[in-house]
Protein backbone atom coordinates (compact mmCIF):
# COMPACT_ATOMS: atom_id res chain seq x y z
CA UNK A 1 0.00 0.00 0.00
CA UNK A 2 1.33 3.44 -0.95
CA UNK A 3 1.49 5.82 1.99
CA UNK A 4 1.26 9.57 1.47
CA UNK A 5 4.38 11.32 2.72
CA UNK A 6 3.05 14.87 2.94
CA UNK A 7 2.10 15.88 6.48
CA UNK A 8 -0.64 18.52 6.29
CA UNK A 9 -2.35 18.23 9.68
CA UNK A 10 -1.27 18.42 13.31
CA UNK A 11 -3.21 17.25 16.38
CA UNK A 12 -2.79 18.98 19.74
CA UNK A 13 -4.31 17.06 22.68
CA UNK A 14 -5.14 19.87 25.13
CA UNK A 15 -7.98 18.44 27.22
CA UNK A 16 -5.89 17.71 30.34
CA UNK A 17 -6.72 19.36 33.66
CA UNK A 18 -3.23 20.61 34.52
CA UNK A 19 -3.50 19.61 38.17
CA UNK A 20 0.25 20.02 38.78
CA UNK A 21 -0.15 23.75 38.31
CA UNK A 22 -3.14 24.37 40.55
CA UNK A 23 -4.37 26.90 41.53
CA UNK A 24 -3.06 28.68 38.40
CA UNK A 25 -4.97 26.23 36.18
CA UNK A 26 -8.23 26.23 38.15
CA UNK A 27 -9.93 28.47 35.57
CA UNK A 28 -7.26 28.79 32.87
CA UNK A 29 -5.85 26.05 30.61
CA UNK A 30 -2.31 25.01 31.49
CA UNK A 31 -1.52 25.31 27.77
CA UNK A 32 -2.15 29.05 28.07
CA UNK A 33 0.44 29.57 30.81
CA UNK A 34 3.00 32.04 29.42
CA UNK A 35 6.62 31.13 28.83
CA UNK A 36 8.10 34.65 28.72
CA UNK A 37 5.57 36.34 26.39
CA UNK A 38 3.83 33.48 24.56
CA UNK A 39 1.50 30.79 25.87
CA UNK A 40 2.86 27.27 25.91
CA UNK A 41 0.51 26.04 23.18
CA UNK A 42 1.70 28.74 20.79
CA UNK A 43 5.23 27.35 20.80
CA UNK A 44 3.87 23.97 19.65
CA UNK A 45 1.69 25.52 16.94
CA UNK A 46 4.59 27.61 15.66
CA UNK A 47 6.73 24.46 15.53
CA UNK A 48 4.09 22.71 13.43
CA UNK A 49 3.74 25.73 11.15
CA UNK A 50 7.52 25.88 10.65
CA UNK A 51 7.35 22.22 9.55
CA UNK A 52 4.99 23.17 6.71
CA UNK A 53 1.74 22.15 8.44
CA UNK A 54 -1.22 24.46 7.95
CA UNK A 55 -4.18 22.55 9.43
CA UNK A 56 -4.18 22.59 13.25
CA UNK A 57 -6.59 20.33 15.17
CA UNK A 58 -7.09 20.89 18.89
CA UNK A 59 -8.65 18.16 21.04
CA UNK A 60 -10.15 20.13 23.91
CA UNK A 61 -12.23 19.68 27.03
CA UNK A 62 -14.16 21.84 29.46
CA UNK A 63 -12.61 25.18 30.50
CA UNK A 64 -10.46 25.33 27.35
CA UNK A 65 -12.26 28.20 25.63
CA UNK A 66 -9.23 30.46 26.05
CA UNK A 67 -7.29 28.31 23.56
CA UNK A 68 -10.00 28.79 20.93
CA UNK A 69 -10.06 32.54 21.59
CA UNK A 70 -6.27 32.77 21.34
CA UNK A 71 -6.25 31.26 17.85
CA UNK A 72 -9.19 33.36 16.66
CA UNK A 73 -9.23 36.86 15.20
CA UNK A 74 -9.49 39.52 17.92
CA UNK A 75 -11.34 42.17 15.91
CA UNK A 76 -11.78 44.68 18.75
CA UNK A 77 -8.15 44.41 19.84
CA UNK A 78 -6.87 44.74 16.29
CA UNK A 79 -9.07 47.79 15.66
CA UNK A 80 -7.83 49.47 18.84
CA UNK A 81 -4.18 48.80 18.00
CA UNK A 82 -4.67 50.05 14.45
CA UNK A 83 -6.38 53.24 15.64
CA UNK A 84 -3.57 53.84 18.13
CA UNK A 85 -0.95 53.39 15.41
CA UNK A 86 0.67 50.48 17.23
CA UNK A 87 1.67 48.68 14.06
CA UNK A 88 4.30 46.42 15.64
CA UNK A 89 1.84 45.10 18.23
CA UNK A 90 -0.84 44.71 15.56
CA UNK A 91 1.50 42.58 13.45
CA UNK A 92 2.40 40.53 16.52
CA UNK A 93 -1.25 39.81 17.32
CA UNK A 94 -2.03 38.87 13.72
CA UNK A 95 0.98 36.55 13.56
CA UNK A 96 -0.67 34.20 16.07
CA UNK A 97 -2.90 32.90 13.27
CA UNK A 98 -1.37 33.46 9.82
CA UNK A 99 -3.78 33.82 6.90
CA UNK A 100 -2.80 30.43 5.46
CA UNK A 101 -3.36 28.53 8.73
CA UNK A 102 -6.70 27.12 9.84
CA UNK A 103 -7.71 25.80 13.25
CA UNK A 104 -10.37 23.24 14.14
CA UNK A 105 -11.55 22.12 17.56
CA UNK A 106 -13.05 18.83 18.70
CA UNK A 107 -14.11 17.83 22.22
CA UNK A 108 -12.78 14.85 24.13
CA UNK A 109 -15.93 14.10 26.16
CA UNK A 110 -14.13 12.00 28.77
CA UNK A 111 -10.51 11.87 29.91
CA UNK A 112 -9.67 8.36 28.74
CA UNK A 113 -6.02 8.84 27.84
CA UNK A 114 -3.78 10.19 25.09
CA UNK A 115 -4.75 7.44 22.66
CA UNK A 116 -8.41 8.33 23.09
CA UNK A 117 -7.65 12.02 22.55
CA UNK A 118 -5.91 11.23 19.27
CA UNK A 119 -8.82 9.00 18.23
CA UNK A 120 -11.21 11.92 18.81
CA UNK A 121 -9.37 13.78 16.02
CA UNK A 122 -9.89 11.02 13.43
CA UNK A 123 -12.92 12.63 11.71
CA UNK A 124 -10.86 15.77 11.08
CA UNK A 125 -7.63 13.99 10.16
CA UNK A 126 -9.12 11.48 7.72
CA UNK A 127 -7.05 8.91 5.87
CA UNK A 128 -3.69 10.66 5.78
CA UNK A 129 -0.56 10.92 7.92
CA UNK A 130 -0.60 13.48 10.71
CA UNK A 131 1.55 14.93 13.46
CA UNK A 132 0.80 14.86 17.18
CA UNK A 133 2.38 17.51 19.40
CA UNK A 134 2.13 17.51 23.18
CA UNK A 135 2.31 21.13 24.32
CA UNK A 136 3.78 20.10 27.68
CA UNK A 137 6.97 19.27 25.80
CA UNK A 138 8.41 22.58 24.64
CA UNK A 139 10.97 21.73 21.97
CA UNK A 140 13.72 24.07 20.82
CA UNK A 141 15.71 23.11 17.74
CA UNK A 142 19.49 23.57 17.50
CA UNK A 143 20.74 27.10 16.93
CA UNK A 144 20.70 27.75 13.21
CA UNK A 145 19.06 24.37 12.53
CA UNK A 146 15.61 22.99 11.89
CA UNK A 147 12.89 22.87 14.55
CA UNK A 148 12.30 19.36 15.88
CA UNK A 149 9.07 18.59 13.99
CA UNK A 150 10.60 19.81 10.73
CA UNK A 151 13.45 17.32 11.27
CA UNK A 152 10.86 14.58 11.75
CA UNK A 153 8.92 15.56 8.63
CA UNK A 154 12.11 15.13 6.61
CA UNK A 155 12.64 11.67 8.12
CA UNK A 156 9.01 10.72 7.44
CA UNK A 157 9.29 11.71 3.79
CA UNK A 158 12.28 9.41 3.48
CA UNK A 159 10.72 6.42 5.26
CA UNK A 160 6.99 6.79 4.58
CA UNK A 161 6.26 5.25 7.99
CA UNK A 162 5.44 6.52 11.46
CA UNK A 163 8.22 8.43 13.20
CA UNK A 164 8.40 9.12 16.95
CA UNK A 165 10.77 11.56 18.65
CA UNK A 166 12.92 10.00 21.37
CA UNK A 167 15.65 11.02 23.78
CA UNK A 168 17.75 9.20 26.35
CA UNK A 169 16.30 9.68 29.83
CA UNK A 170 17.85 9.13 33.29
CA UNK A 171 17.23 5.72 34.83
CA UNK A 172 15.20 7.20 37.67
CA UNK A 173 12.89 8.87 35.13
CA UNK A 174 12.21 5.82 32.94
CA UNK A 175 8.90 5.07 34.66
CA UNK A 176 7.50 8.40 33.45
CA UNK A 177 7.93 7.70 29.73
CA UNK A 178 6.98 5.45 26.90
CA UNK A 179 10.24 3.54 26.31
CA UNK A 180 11.42 2.14 22.96
CA UNK A 181 14.07 -0.34 21.86
CA UNK A 182 15.10 -1.48 18.40
CA UNK A 183 17.76 -1.67 15.72
CA UNK A 184 19.67 1.22 14.07
CA UNK A 185 18.16 2.20 10.72
CA UNK A 186 20.70 4.78 9.59
CA UNK A 187 21.41 8.30 10.75
CA UNK A 188 19.16 9.38 13.61
CA UNK A 189 16.63 6.60 13.01
CA UNK A 190 16.00 3.34 14.82
CA UNK A 191 13.41 0.78 13.74
CA UNK A 192 11.37 0.12 16.86
CA UNK A 193 11.02 -3.50 17.96
CA UNK A 194 9.50 -2.83 21.39
CA UNK A 195 7.58 0.06 22.88
CA UNK A 196 6.34 -0.01 26.48
CA UNK A 197 4.32 2.60 28.38
CA UNK A 198 5.91 3.74 31.67
CA UNK A 199 7.81 0.56 32.62
CA UNK A 200 9.74 0.12 35.85
CA UNK A 201 13.44 0.80 35.34
CA UNK A 202 14.47 -2.81 36.05
CA UNK A 203 12.30 -4.18 33.22
CA UNK A 204 12.55 -1.31 30.72
CA UNK A 205 13.94 -2.39 27.32
CA UNK A 206 16.16 0.72 27.13
CA UNK A 207 16.41 4.30 28.35
CA UNK A 208 15.14 5.84 25.11
CA UNK A 209 12.00 7.77 26.05
CA UNK A 210 9.27 9.12 23.78
CA UNK A 211 9.47 12.91 23.71
CA UNK A 212 6.03 14.27 22.85
CA UNK A 213 6.31 14.52 19.04
CA UNK A 214 4.86 11.96 16.64
CA UNK A 215 4.18 11.62 12.94
CA UNK A 216 1.73 8.76 12.49
CA UNK A 217 0.15 6.95 9.59
CA UNK A 218 -3.67 6.76 9.66
CA UNK A 219 -3.60 3.01 10.34
CA UNK A 220 -2.99 3.84 13.99
CA UNK A 221 -6.65 4.86 14.39
CA UNK A 222 -7.95 1.31 13.94
CA UNK A 223 -5.33 0.00 16.35
CA UNK A 224 -6.32 2.50 19.05
CA UNK A 225 -10.01 1.81 18.50
CA UNK A 226 -9.62 -1.94 18.92
CA UNK A 227 -7.14 -2.09 21.81
CA UNK A 228 -7.99 -2.75 25.47
CA UNK A 229 -7.28 -0.14 28.10
CA UNK A 230 -3.70 -0.03 29.30
CA UNK A 231 -1.66 1.60 32.07
CA UNK A 232 -3.86 3.55 34.49
CA UNK A 233 -7.00 2.15 32.88
CA UNK A 234 -6.52 4.57 29.98
CA UNK A 235 -6.46 4.17 26.21
CA UNK A 236 -2.74 4.65 25.61
CA UNK A 237 -1.27 5.96 22.37
CA UNK A 238 1.82 3.85 23.06
CA UNK A 239 -0.29 0.67 22.97
CA UNK A 240 -1.83 1.69 19.65
CA UNK A 241 1.62 2.24 18.19
CA UNK A 242 2.75 -1.16 19.49
CA UNK A 243 -0.19 -2.79 17.69
CA UNK A 244 0.58 -0.82 14.51
CA UNK A 245 4.09 -2.32 14.52
CA UNK A 246 2.57 -5.72 13.74
CA UNK A 247 1.55 -4.38 10.31
CA UNK A 248 4.14 -1.77 9.39
CA UNK A 249 7.49 -0.39 10.47
CA UNK A 250 7.61 2.38 13.08
CA UNK A 251 10.77 4.43 13.59
CA UNK A 252 12.25 6.27 16.56
CA UNK A 253 14.02 9.52 15.71
CA UNK A 254 16.78 10.96 17.89
CA UNK A 255 16.18 14.64 17.26
CA UNK A 256 18.61 17.52 17.53
CA UNK A 257 17.56 20.17 20.01
CA UNK A 258 16.39 20.54 23.58
CA UNK A 259 13.19 19.49 25.31
CA UNK A 260 11.70 21.25 28.31
CA UNK A 261 9.24 19.23 30.35
CA UNK A 262 6.73 22.00 30.97
CA UNK A 263 4.34 19.51 32.51
CA UNK A 264 6.45 19.89 35.65
CA UNK A 265 7.05 23.10 37.57
CA UNK A 266 10.81 22.59 37.40
CA UNK A 267 10.79 22.15 33.62
CA UNK A 268 8.45 25.10 33.17
CA UNK A 269 10.80 27.33 35.17
CA UNK A 270 13.82 26.06 33.22
CA UNK A 271 12.10 26.91 29.93
CA UNK A 272 11.06 30.34 31.17
CA UNK A 273 14.55 31.18 32.42
CA UNK A 274 16.47 29.94 29.39
CA UNK A 275 14.10 31.39 26.80
CA UNK A 276 14.07 34.69 28.69
CA UNK A 277 17.87 34.81 28.39
CA UNK A 278 17.53 34.32 24.61
CA UNK A 279 14.75 36.89 24.21
CA UNK A 280 15.82 39.89 22.06
CA UNK A 281 14.01 42.44 24.23
CA UNK A 282 14.58 41.24 27.79
CA UNK A 283 17.51 38.81 27.54
CA UNK A 284 20.33 41.21 28.40
CA UNK A 285 18.46 42.83 31.29
CA UNK A 286 17.41 39.47 32.69
CA UNK A 287 20.98 38.15 32.51
CA UNK A 288 22.22 41.17 34.45
CA UNK A 289 19.52 40.60 37.06
CA UNK A 290 20.49 36.94 37.49
CA UNK A 291 24.17 37.81 37.90
CA UNK A 292 23.23 40.14 40.73
CA UNK A 293 21.41 37.50 42.75
CA UNK A 294 23.03 36.08 45.86
CA UNK A 295 22.59 32.36 45.21
Ranges and model annotations:
Residues 1-6, 288-295:
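Basic/polar N-terminal segments that are highly enriched at the extreme N-terminus
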Residues 9, 54-56, 102, 129, ...:
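Residues at the starts of beta-strands that form the adenosine-phosphate
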Residues 131, 143-147, 153-157, 184-287:
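Catalytic-core segments of class I nucleotidyltransferases/pyrophosphorylases
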Amino acid sequence: MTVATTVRKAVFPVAGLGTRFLPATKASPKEMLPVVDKPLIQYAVEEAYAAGIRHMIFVTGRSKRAIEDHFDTAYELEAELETAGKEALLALVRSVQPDDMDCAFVRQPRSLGLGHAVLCAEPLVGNEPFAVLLADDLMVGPQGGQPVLAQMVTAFRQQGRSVIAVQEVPEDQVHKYGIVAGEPAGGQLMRIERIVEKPKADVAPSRMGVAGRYILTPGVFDEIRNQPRGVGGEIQLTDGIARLMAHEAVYAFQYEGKRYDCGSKEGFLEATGELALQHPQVGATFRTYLKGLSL
